[in-house]
């Protein structure tokens, strides 16, 4: 009975949402722009030939660009207008967020100056995006020229044509940012996040197909179809377990109770307002940092195919070697501690608590509060940082052990982004539904009050002919009667008879 009632309530909410014109338009705008982004992402630029063999294409691009293809929306794999994608904008956002702390006082002042300061920082971020986009587009062109398997080639490799590709890819970055802004303002959810999520979801079917074909050759058997089915079933089960584990970690928080000065201990700690600190407070940013640092020597070595440095990098710094994977894990753990501290900012929290007359029960305001929050954050990171590192290196470990291609969309990094984006989209839809319900309720109440007032005005409408002083509006006034001199021949009034 309870399940039936809950289903009916859910159905009623969905029907109410679909009847709301503004909400339906927002969803339609979001879906249309995401579809437009995906269509442009699969159309190669003119003058570029791409091999039909996806494995050769993946081998022709380094792991660094595989990650940035994931972050950029998936346009790099087809060398489309969105080949660079929105990953330069994400890099610029991360750098501006780091510099907006106490590292650069003017930026820190802007970050603390309200909405106007945030708009200026956003404008600066757009300018910082430009060099990142140009450098990444140039690196893509250089790697295509130096690739060994010919998965991608230019029909005309002249300097002017390559400069045209760099300008076009850079322009595609800003077009992607523009589409994301429209989704954020006119649609549902965060536009940039949804574009990244669309790229990950678009790559999932191809990733599953590739893994199904590859896993069939891992174990030699008389029945390859059965072997492929069993191996892929185990792989898909592991994928679901990893998905559930990441969802659990992303939604796990450490709650620090907060109390207002002057209020007695009326409620217990479990009922007090609290400060939530996520188990994975840094998100996927440490993975991006570590990948960027690891990619620098790899990318430089790609430009010098015959040098000894290239073989050293491939033997020790590549993410396909145990040494490279170990170094990658260490960098992720270090950046997780570093970025989570910047993200939470215990010093700023302690200062805000002091200004708003709030405190943590049992902890003195000020420096002790800062130390307490830092201590809690460090304890959380001892769990969250290794978990994030293990999740990030899963595709590389699978590739190293089973000798299968690296598919980051099916790996930990792609799942982390997918889970975070899906949870953010769910919160946005729920917020939109709540806002829609309140707007409809307010509109109904306003219409009801207006109708009641109109009815009361009609029922209690005064006789304007008796409004001698014009207090009820402009109308014909009735002049007050003046005393006339009585004529002795006039008849007496009734009142005068008494």
Curated annotation (Swiss-Prot):
Gene: secY
Domain of life (superkingdom): Bacteria
GO BP, sorted A to Z: intracellular protein transmembrane transport; protein targeting; protein transport by the Sec complex
Cellular component GO terms, alphabetical: plasma membrane
Keywords: Cell membrane, Membrane, Protein transport, Translocation, Transmembrane, Transmembrane helix, Transport
Topology in the lipid bilayer: Multi-pass membrane protein
Protein name: Protein translocase subunit SecY
Transmembrane segments annotated in the record for this chain: 23-43, 65-87, 124-144, 163-183, 191-211, 229-249, 281-301, 322-342, 382-402, 406-426
Taxonomic source organism: Mycoplasmoides gallisepticum (strain R(low / passage 15 / clone 2)) (Mycoplasma gallisepticum)
Localisation: Cell membrane
InterPro entries the record matches: SecY, SecY/SEC61-alpha, SecY_CS, SecY_dom_sf
HAMAP family listed in its UniProt record: SecY
Keyword Oxidoreductase among UniProt keywords: no
Record-linked Gene3D superfamilies: SecY subunit domain (1.10.3370.10)
Residue ranges, compositional bias (Basic and acidic residues): 478-488
Keyword Flavoprotein: no
């Amino acid at each position: 009975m309870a399940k039936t009632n809950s289903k009916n309530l859910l159905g009623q909410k969905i029907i109410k949402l679909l009847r709301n014109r503004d909400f339906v338009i927002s969803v339609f705008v979001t879906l249309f722009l995401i579809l437009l982004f995906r269509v442009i992402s699969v159309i190669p630029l003119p003058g570029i030939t791409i091999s039909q063999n996806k494995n050769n294409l993946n081998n022709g691009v380094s792991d660094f660009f595989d990650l940035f293809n994931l972050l950029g929306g998936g346009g790099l794999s087809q060398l489309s207008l969105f080949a660079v994608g929105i990953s330069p904008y994400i890099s610029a956002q991360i750098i501006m967020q780091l510099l907006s702390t106490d590292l650069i006082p003017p930026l820190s002042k802007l970050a603390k100056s309200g909405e106007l300061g945030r708009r200026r920082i956003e404008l600066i971020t757009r300018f910082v995006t430009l060099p990142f986009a140009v450098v990444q587009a140039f690196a893509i062109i250089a790697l295509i020229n130096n690739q060994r398997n010919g998965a991608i080639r230019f029909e005309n490799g002249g300097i002017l044509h390559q400069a045209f590709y760099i300008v076009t890819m850079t322009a595609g970055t800003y077009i992607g940012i523009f589409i994301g802004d429209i989704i954020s303002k006119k649609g549902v959810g965060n536009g940039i996040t949804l574009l990244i999520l669309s790229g990950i979801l678009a790559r999932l079917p191809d990733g599953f197909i590739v893994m199904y074909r590859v896993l069939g050759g891992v174990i030699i058997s008389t029945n390859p179809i059965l072997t492929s089915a069993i191996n892929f079933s185990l792989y898909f089960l592991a994928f679901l377990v990893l998905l559930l584990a990441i969802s659990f970690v992303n939604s796990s928080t450490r709650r620090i109770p907060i109390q207002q000065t002057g209020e007695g201990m009326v409620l217990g700690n479990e009922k007090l307002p609290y400060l939530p600190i996520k188990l994975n407070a840094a998100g996927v940013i440490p993975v991006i940092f570590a990948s960027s640092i690891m990619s620098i020597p790899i990318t430089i070595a790609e430009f010098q195919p015959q040098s000894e440095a290239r073989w050293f990098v491939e033997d020790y710094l590549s993410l396909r070697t145990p040494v490279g994977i170990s170094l990658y894990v260490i960098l992720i753990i270090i950046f997780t501690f570093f970025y989570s501290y910047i993200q939470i900012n215990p010093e700023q929290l302690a200062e805000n608590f002091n200004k708003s007359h709030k405190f943590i029960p049992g902890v003195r305001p000020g420096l002790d509060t800062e130390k307490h929050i830092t201590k809690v954050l460090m304890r959380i990171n001892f769990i969250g940082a290794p978990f994030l590192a293990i999740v990030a290196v899963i595709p590389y470990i699978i590739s190293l052990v089973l000798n299968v291609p690296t598919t980051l969309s099916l790996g930990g990094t792609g799942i982390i982004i997918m889970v975070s984006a899906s949870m953010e989209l769910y919160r946005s839809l729920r917020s939109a539904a709540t806002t829609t319900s309140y707007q409809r309720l307010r509109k109904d109440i306003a219409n009801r009050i207006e109708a009641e007032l109109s009815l009361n005005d009609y029922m209690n409408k005064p006789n304007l002919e008796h409004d001698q002083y014009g207090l009820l509006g402009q109308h014909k006034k009735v002049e007050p009667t003046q005393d006339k001199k009585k004529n002795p021949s006039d008849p007496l009034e009734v009142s005068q008879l008494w």
